[in-house]
């Protein structure tokens, strides 16, 4: 379906391009909505990331073939997502993030088809493989009726071409149908050179990703108009920005301001001194600096906690707002964690850490079913083949973790912005406190493994002697000892999450 049904056409885009030339490429000024208000709303959310083509089909099939190595469209759709919102909400998620929605190159390339949504051809058309404009609007409406939010993945760093960069037919792109809108062809060769990162091209000689000159006011002006209309037409609450570190930084701010909603930028870099400054240009950043130490600690029982505890502190001092970082342990670009370890206790600990740490938790579809695909394309499985089992041990764990996070936010308006502190640690466990006095959660994460056990005492909890606290995972209760300390036993390597009984009152958690 064309966006033209909403009053936004290729002709309008062409007019904008022509007008911007007439005014000497001066930036277009918009009546901006309140991005900060949107960002504040997102701090309290828990996001379920969906690869639209692989989550749920319109026909409801749980047997339809989807061979990931074929890299073909498998039939996932907006209607499929709508029909499975109970499944998502049953895990306590308050938002979803879906794949890019615009028209893709149609070719069967050396890397298959563009089922993932990152090979853009035309921003004036929707990708009809996922459904119609009305179905996308219905998805937003159904989410909002449940007080849930919609985040859509957006690409504005590049287009895509099936072939070498020297052979690109720019006239096939809409609306940027001339080479002058793009950087000259050169593949990125040095990721330590920011000019090379921003001005050269991602991709390779098989599938080229022509790099837009987003620093050009003509180009970013079109995207400002486009995203403003796009967000309003489809009632979108937030945007995930693909390849953000490859975009001119000033353009990131212009785009977010024009969108009027929270933007979560993909900055694929584990160094916080590189990643954190991107919050000067957009509100949110994917938390790769946290991803790597989390991955290393929870995937290896011989790893020690020092790197992870250090990174918690470093992010708090380096990033302007850790509550707006997007935390994850799996996504469409990374291997699934169960492909690295089959130890269920380690998998549960990393899930708990992601959901209960500083920032916005993002769980990748299929984590709740223990999907174990490795590198792309193996990590983009069809979820329907799992049967959407709500009795899965990971589905039940994620439900509990989201439930306690949502309850903590309900009881304590400062919970999301309260910075976690590591109150106790050793080589193989970390205990954190998050939340204001009388409402704080004490979470204990470990990498002992399913055969591991350890008796520990956690001090500096902020509890008072005699306070009753409950581990929401096991539902076992403990009385705080002298000075509020907790003496507990880690058994079977399981994480523990303690909350005061007063916080749980009326929640239904552990029958409270």
Curated annotation (Swiss-Prot):
Gene Ontology cellular-component terms listed? extracellular region
Active-site residues from the entry = 242, 266
**What InterPro entries does this protein's entry cite?**
A-amylase-like (IPR013777), A_amylase_C_dom (IPR015340), Glyco_hydro_13_cat_dom (IPR006047), Glyco_hydro_b (IPR013780), Glycoside_hydrolase_SF (IPR017853)
- Name of the coding gene: AMY1
Q: Please state the span of the N-terminal signal peptide per the UniProt entry.
A: 1-25
Q: Name one Pfam family in it.
A: Alpha-amylase
- Tell me what organism the protein belongs to: Schwanniomyces occidentalis (Yeast)
Give the UniProt subcellular location, in the record's own words: Secreted
Q: Where is this site: Transition state stabilizer?
A: 333
Glycosylated residues in this chain: 233
Positions contributing to Ca(2+) 1 binding: 157, 198, 211, 246
What cofactor requirement does the entry state?
Answer: Ca(2+)
Give the binding site residues for substrate: 119, 158, 240, 245-246, 270, 333, 380
Q: What class of enzyme is it?
A: hydrolase
Q: Which family does it belong to?
A: Belongs to the glycosyl hydrolase 13 family.
Residue sites binding Ca(2+) 2 per the record: 242, 266
State the EC number(s): 3.2.1.1
GO MF annotations for this entry?
Answer: alpha-amylase activity; calcium ion binding
The protein's name in its UniProt record? Alpha-amylase 1
Q: What keywords were assigned to this record?
A: Calcium, Carbohydrate metabolism, Disulfide bond, Glycoprotein, Glycosidase, Hydrolase, Metal-binding, Secreted, Signal
Co-factor: note: Binds 2 calcium ions per subunit. Calcium is inhibitory at high concentrations.
Q: What is its main location?
A: secreted
Q: Which cysteines are joined by disulfide bonds?
A: 66-74, 186-200, 276-319, 475-510
Q: Which reaction does it catalyse?
A: Endohydrolysis of (1->4)-alpha-D-glucosidic linkages in polysaccharides containing three or more (1->4)-alpha-linked D-glucose units
Activity regulation behaviour: Alpha-amylase expression underlies catabolite repression by glucose.
Q: Which GO terms describe its biological process?
A: carbohydrate catabolic process
């Amino acid at each position: 379906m064309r966006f033209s049904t909403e009053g936004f056409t290729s002709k309008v885009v062409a007019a904008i391009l022509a007008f911007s030339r007439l005014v000497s490429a001066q930036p277009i000024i918009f009546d901006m909505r309140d991005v900060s208000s949107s960002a504040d709303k997102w701090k309290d959310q828990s996001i379920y990331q969906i690869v639209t083509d692989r989550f749920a089909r319109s026909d409801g099939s749980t047997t339809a073939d989807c061979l990931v190595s074929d890299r073909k469209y498998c039939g996932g759709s907006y209607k499929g997502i709508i029909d499975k919102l109970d499944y998502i909400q049953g895990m306590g998620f308050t938002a979803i993030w879906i794949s890019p929605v615009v028209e893709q190159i149609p070719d069967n390339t050396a890397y298959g088809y563009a089922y993932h949504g990152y090979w853009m051809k035309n921003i004036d058309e929707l990708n009809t493989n996922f459904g119609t404009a009305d179905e996308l609007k219905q998805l937003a409406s159904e989410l909002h009726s449940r007080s849930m939010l919609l985040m859509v993945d957006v690409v504005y760093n590049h287009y895509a071409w099936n072939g070498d960069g020297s052979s690109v037919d720019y006239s096939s792109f809409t609306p940027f149908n001339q080479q002058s809108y793009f950087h000259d062809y050169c593949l990125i060769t040095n990721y330590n050179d920011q000019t090379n990162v921003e001005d050269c091209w991602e991709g390779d000689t098989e599938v080229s990703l022509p790099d837009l000159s987003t620093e050009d006011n003509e180009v970013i002006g079109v995207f400002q108009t486009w995203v403003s209309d796009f967000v309003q037409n489809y009632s979108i609450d937030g945007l995930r920005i693909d390849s953000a570190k490859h975009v001119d930084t000033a353009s990131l701010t212009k785009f977010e301001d024009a969108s009027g909603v929270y933007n979560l930028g993909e900055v694929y870099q584990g160094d916080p001194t590189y990643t954190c400054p991107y919050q000067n240009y957009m509100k949110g950043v994917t938390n790769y600096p946290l991803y790597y130490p989390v991955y290393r600690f929870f995937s290896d029982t011989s790893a020690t906690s020092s790197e992870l505890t250090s990174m918690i502190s470093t992010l708090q001092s380096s990033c302007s707002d850790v509550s707006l970082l997007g935390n994850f342990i799996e996504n469409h670009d990374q291997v699934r964690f169960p492909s690295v370890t089959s130890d269920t206790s380690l998998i549960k600990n990393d899930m708990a850490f992601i959901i209960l740490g500083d920032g916005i938790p993002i769980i990748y579809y299929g984590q709740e079913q223990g999907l174990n695909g490795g590198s792309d394309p193996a990590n983009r499985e069809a979820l329907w083949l799992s049967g959407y089992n709500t009795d899965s041990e990971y589905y039940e764990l994620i439900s509990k973790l989201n439930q306690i996070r949502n309850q903590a936010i309900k009881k304590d308006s400062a919970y999301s912005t309260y910075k976690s502190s590591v109150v106790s640690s050793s080589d193989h466990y970390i205990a954190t406190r998050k939340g204001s006095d009388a409402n704080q959660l004490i979470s204990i994460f470990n990498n002992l493994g399913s055969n591991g056990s350890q008796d520990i005492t956690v001090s500096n909890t902020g509890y008072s002697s005699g306070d009753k606290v409950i581990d929401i995972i096991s539902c076992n209760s403990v009385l705080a000892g002298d000075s509020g300390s907790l003496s507990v036993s880690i058994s079977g390597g399981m994480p523990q999450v303690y909350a005061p009984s007063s916080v749980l009152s009326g929640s239904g958690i552990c029958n409270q």
